[in-house]
Amino acid sequence: MEAEVINQLNNTLNDLEKRSEDIRVYMDYQGKKDRLEEVIGLSEDPELWNDPKRAQEIGKERKILEGIVLTLDNIASGIEDNRMLIEMTVEENDEEGFAAVQEDVAGLEKQMADLEFKRMFNQPADPNNCFIDITAGAGGTEAEDWAGMLFRMYSRYAERKGFKIEILEEDDGEIAGINRATIRVEGEYAYGLLRTETGVHRLVRYSPFDSNNKRHTSFASVFVYPEIDDSIEIEINPADLRIDTYRASGAGGQHINKTDSAVRITHEPTGIVVQCQNDRSQHANKAAAMEMLKSKLYELEMRKRNEEKQALEEGKSDVGWGSQIRSYVLDSSRIKDLRTGYEVGNTKAVLDGDLDGFIEASLKQGV
């Protein structure tokens, strides 16, 4: 075993120790450890299961806290253990054992990198589930097909992450794709990961719907907002709501047009409209629509609070509803994020849900 390799491995452990100390302070390790002990006590109380919703929230919080506290504990013990193992394997000239230490240290580095990535989730709702609204821009079939492609892209991304997806509303295009759709994404840090996808997405391609095979440009809007749990209070005055029911349309079977089960809720002070038609029950659709409304009102309030700050930050573009954030040029095999400059050539992989590079770049740059 070469001295340089041994020194490099020891330096890696020293670096991990420093990064671990920094992240313990940043993430308030002791506070999270104390809270985890409280949550474990709550989760072991038999009375908790009389309130399934509360039990689910406690379970979710426990999982998030354990992901931070136990990982930091494991890194700390791993650093000490591997320091001793380096000494032992060097003394005994155990090359196989030393290789095992190198592999274990690489695993610790991966755990640390994952934790450092989570540092970028700095909004209160980042750990939450989220909703994604996708709306086709002007342009008929071209735009509707593009919206359908984005719908598939985000669905595939969620599947890759092991997230659960639920289609709350889907209005099919006349020939292809969708006019609009809303999907719910359930998973740890779903909102934190997807929130920077809000904006206008631009597609340039040779159209499969044009007999002359001309190049077309299409637009679709994406709006991502968090699902709000009981830890964030949103007050809604019933007098501010207009609730309409209608017969659901689109895919769903023969039953779907027989009753006015679909629900549309308009929040008149803000003009926000939400709708849900995925359930046979009008009551269930109304409950789901109310959750969507709470989430949109929360997102609106957060955006108002950040508006002044965003306006003052040089070089940071507005990522609101009307801004173009990404360009997909298929015939040139190029997809570029206009905010971060991140660019890839494998368009097929991206449209199949490989969004990690774009998301990581946007979070690192604080988009």
Swiss-Prot record:
InterPro entries: PCRF, Pep_chain_release_fac_I, Pep_chain_release_fac_I_sf, PrfB. One of its GO terms (cellular component) is cytoplasm. Transmembrane segments: none annotated. The keyword Oxidoreductase does not apply. SUPFAM superfamilies: Release factor. Methylated by PrmC. Methylation increases the termination efficiency of RF2. PROSITE patterns: RF_PROK_I (PS00745). It holds the Pfam family PCRF. SMART domains: PCRF. The keyword Thylakoid does not apply. GO terms for molecular function: translation release factor activity, codon specific. The modification N5-methylglutamine is found at Q254. It is found in: Cytoplasm. Keywords: Cytoplasm, Methylation, Protein biosynthesis. PANTHER family: CLASS I PEPTIDE CHAIN RELEASE FACTOR (PTHR43116:SF3), PEPTIDE CHAIN RELEASE FACTOR 2 (PTHR43116). Peptide chain release factor 2 directs the termination of translation in response to the peptide chain termination codons UGA and UAA. Belongs to the prokaryotic/mitochondrial release factor family. This is Peptide chain release factor 2. It comes from Neisseria meningitidis serogroup C / serotype 2a (strain ATCC 700532 / DSM 15464 / FAM18). The lineage of its organism: Bacteria, Pseudomonadati, Pseudomonadota, Betaproteobacteria, Neisseriales.
